[in-house]
Amino acid sequence: MSGISIQSGAACATPSATDVEGVPARTWQGPSAPERLAILRRARSIAIVGASTNPARASYFVSTYLLSSAPYDVYFVNPRATTILGQPAYASLADLPVVPDIVDVFRRDADLPGVAREAVEVGAKALWLQLGSWNEEAAAIAEDGGLDVVMDRCVKIEHARFHGGLHLAGFNTGEITSRKQRVSARR
């Protein structure tokens, strides 16, 4: 278990300074909730990079939600697939028939800077890295290219929480709620 030790029989302990050596500190500051809502409201199309044909994958679950419960034109990017959920799959962002407003990424960390460069090259408006994805190099590439950036957030959860749909996934923890929030966004 990554070198974190539990002291004095405690069930949970904070890591010591030596436990987190070599782990880069998060310095990038992401958009606020109203800013994320504005990104979602401005968007008309979303490209899902790393979309999967496997129903057990998070990208598949997010894709089904976006197709059934969100107003976006959804495009799938996966060079190994021909169709996903009955829609064509494309080998790259450059192969899409439109420039996507949001590039939603389900790829491993090492691939994120390259996806950010590709999003800038095609003229996308936002780079969205899913839950668990945090890459400051990719964020810098995208921001330097004029894109909005969201990291470590699920586009499905964010859309659902702003539109009262979290109950569809069973979320109601108090931190993320199924109740509609009144958030004003600048357009």
Can you say where each PLM-predicted feature lies in the sequence?
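Helix-enriched interaction subdomains in cytosolic or periplasmic regions
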Residues: 2-23
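Glycine-rich, highly charged phosphate/nucleotide-binding loops
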Residues: 26-32, 83-113
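Conserved beta-strand elements of the Class I
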Residues: 47-49
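NAD(P)-binding Rossmann-fold cofactor-contacting core
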Residues: 52-57, 64-84
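A short helix->loop->beta-strand "cap" motif at the edges of active sites that frequently abuts
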Residues: 69-72, 122-127, 145-147
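ADP-ribose/adenylate-binding Rossmann-like module
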Residues: 119-142
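Short acidic, glycine/proline-enriched helix-loop-strand junctions
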Residues: 136-159
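A charged, well-structured terminal subsegment
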Residues: 158-187
